From Swiss-Prot:
Domain of life per record: Bacteria
Name this protein carries in UniProt: GMP synthase [glutamine-hydrolyzing]
EC number: 6.3.5.2
Keyword ATP-binding annotated: yes
Chain ranges of the GMPS ATP-PPase domain: 206-398
Keyword terms, alphabetized: ATP-binding, Glutamine amidotransferase, GMP biosynthesis, Ligase, Nucleotide-binding, Purine biosynthesis
Protein's organism: Haemophilus ducreyi (strain 35000HP / ATCC 700724)
Function per UniProt: Catalyzes the synthesis of GMP from XMP.
Catalytic activity of the protein: XMP + L-glutamine + ATP + H2O = GMP + L-glutamate + AMP + diphosphate + 2 H(+)
Gene name per UniProt: guaA
Assembly mode: Homodimer.
Glutamine amidotransferase type-1 domain mapped to chain residues: 8-205
Length: 523
């Protein structure tokens, strides 16, 4: 079996908004990496035993006292080191060079001219017409290195940055003032590949097939012949977790699928068909619509609704767990970003490790061990593994759906009538997006039920019925979003279908709010 952790890169985080991108690019190349706060100890680095180290960018200035710096051991470990932006500046300072605040800050696109072809820049050139090789890169810095440390040479320049990259080939230390991890840097992935493969000598063993093989072996080793329970929602993370566990322990996995009446149209049946019939998983389906609706009666405050939905789910999950006498383990779909918690960089910890539980607040007496086979994976890696395990692409690439489901898409009090109307209207919206080729062009699309009535005309009669709002957004990271400019003809078709086919809805509106100031979900 391939050891997927045999070669690994350690990324020390100085607080850059792009740091997770570095990790995702390294994984994309096929090499395992981990993301740690910059102030780790020598002991921790030795225990991790990295094949190479990357120092990330960050918002601080190396010219300030008490600015973050790499542990001294980084430069004594005998492994290649790549400093990116702030990482290059702290490398220069710590090894005897000099940095200064720049009169001209560089933000955005820049063309760097390569001066010396070292291993990092081997075979890279974005401008074949120029006399010197050039790279189109993305800059984002105020400070710059003004004096090289001993043993270093300048490898790239820009008109405003005379040391845009540097290297000490003997010690295998490299620094770049730009960000190779962002897609705006055209040859960024090739540069990182040069570092990881050619300089560090890492093999590409981090592949979906190898990850699956490793996860299955670890699950078998950890749980043996014990019984495991998993809350299956039909979402990407719990679905992939279920298939990995099923492959490892078969019928010893007990999936609890709680149908809370707040799911999309026919979703409960689809989950049972997919995981029960197609994959042969052992699934306990709990039809709990009445229990959830009863608990939500009269509640219209969004946070209160979320808490009730969470509590009722845990109560039901707990009831089912008690019925299974031999269960020793709880499986969860925790993924790597859940494990990394962002904190203010001023604390000196840009990212700290937190204990994260998807099923929050499980009773203490459920003394179960935890199995988290996706704990090392980013979301895109989870999707690739799901595809390799046989899950359909349409399911893996579905738009995000909130944990409380329609509980936060029906504004105000939740009633069965409202949920049914919303389910049917939303199904039409999504169907038309698929048919028109717009579903994958937008990042998220859904329908919201508004607890207001509006006058409409049907035939010769007037009707006084409910209003729904359509919402479709485009975003890269879900932190900010633009409303999607869907064609008027498409919006008209969707509106006509909903009003004609869903009895009880008289008006359809389209939400044209961006984030900020609005959030993506209404509640």
């Amino acid at each position: 079996m391939n050891n997927i952790h045999n070669h690994k890169i350690l990324i020390l985080d100085f607080g850059s908004q792009y740091t997770q991108l570095i990790a995702r690019r390294i994984r994309e190349i096929g090499v395992y990496c981990e993301l740690w706060a910059w102030d780790v100890t020598e002991k921790q680095i030795r225990e991790f035993n990295p094949t190479g180290i990357i120092l990330s960018g960050g918002p601080e200035s190396t010219t300030e006292t008490n600015s973050p710096h790499a542990p001294e051991y980084v430069f004594k470990a005998g492994v290649p080191v790549l400093g990116i932006c702030y990482g290059m500046q702290t490398m220069a300072m710590q090894l005897g060079g000099l940095t200064e605040a720049s009169e001209q800050r560089e933000f955005g696109y820049a063309a760097v001219e390569l001066q010396h072809a070292d291993q990092l820049f081997a075979k890279l050139n974005d401008d074949l017409t120029a006399s010197q090789p050039k790279l189109d890169v993305w800059m984002s810095h105020g400070d710059k290195v003004t004096r090289l440390p001993a043993g270093f040479q300048t490898t790239a320049v820009t008109p405003t940055c005379p040391i845009a990259a540097m290297s000490d080939e003997k010690r295998r230390f490299y620094g770049v003032q730009f960000h190779p991890e962002v897609t705006h840097t055209k040859s960024g992935l090739a540069l990182l590949t040069n570092f990881v493969e050619n300089i560090c000598g890492c093999a590409r063993s981090w592949t979906p097939e190898n990850i699956i093989e490793d996860a299955v072996a670890k699950i078998k080793q950890k749980v043996g012949n014990d019984q495991v329970i998993l809350g299956l929602s039909g979402g990407v993370d719990s679905s992939v977790t279920a298939l990995l566990l099923h492959r490892a322990i078969g019928k010893n996995l007990h999936c609890v699928f709680v149908d809370n009446g707040l799911l999309r149209l026919n979703e409960g049946d689809q989950v049972m068909e997919m995981f029960g019939d197609k994959f042969g998983l052992n699934i306990i389906r709990v039809n709990a619509e009445e229990r959830f609706l009863e608990a939500l009666k009269g509640i219209d405050e969004p946070e209160a609704k979320r808490k009730i939905i969470g509590k009722v789910f845990i109560d039901i999950f707990d009831d089912e767990a008690k019925k299974l006498t031999d269960v020793k383990w709880l499986a969860q779909g925790t993924i790597y970003p859940d494990v990394i918690e962002s904190a203010a960089s001023k604390t000196g910890k840009a990212h700290v490790i937190k204990s994260h539980h998807n099923v929050g607040g499980l009773p203490d007496y459920m003394k179960l061990g935890l199995v988290e086979p996706l704990r090392e994976l980013f979301k895109d890696e989870v999707r690739k593994i799901g595809l390799t395990l046989g899950l359909p692409a349409e399911m893996l690439n579905r738009h995000p759906f909130p944990g409380p489901g329609l509980g936060v898409r029906v504004l105000g009090e939740i009633k069965k009538e409202y949920c049914d109307l919303l389910r049917n209207a939303d199904a039409i919206f999504i169907e038309e997006l698929y048919k028109s080729g717009w579903y994958y062009k937008v990042s998220q699309a859904f329908t919201v039920f508004l607890p207001v009535k509006s006058v409409g005309v049907m035939g010769d009669g007037r009707k006084y019925d409910w209003v729904v709002s359509l919402r479709a957004v485009e975003t890269i990271d879900f932190m900010t979003a633009h409303w999607a400019h869907l064609p008027y003809e498409l919006l008209g078709k969707i509106s006509n279908r909903i009003i004609n086919e869903v009895n009880g809805i008289s008006r359809v509106v389209y939400d044209v709010s961006g984030k900020p100031p609005a959030t993506i979900e209404w509640e």
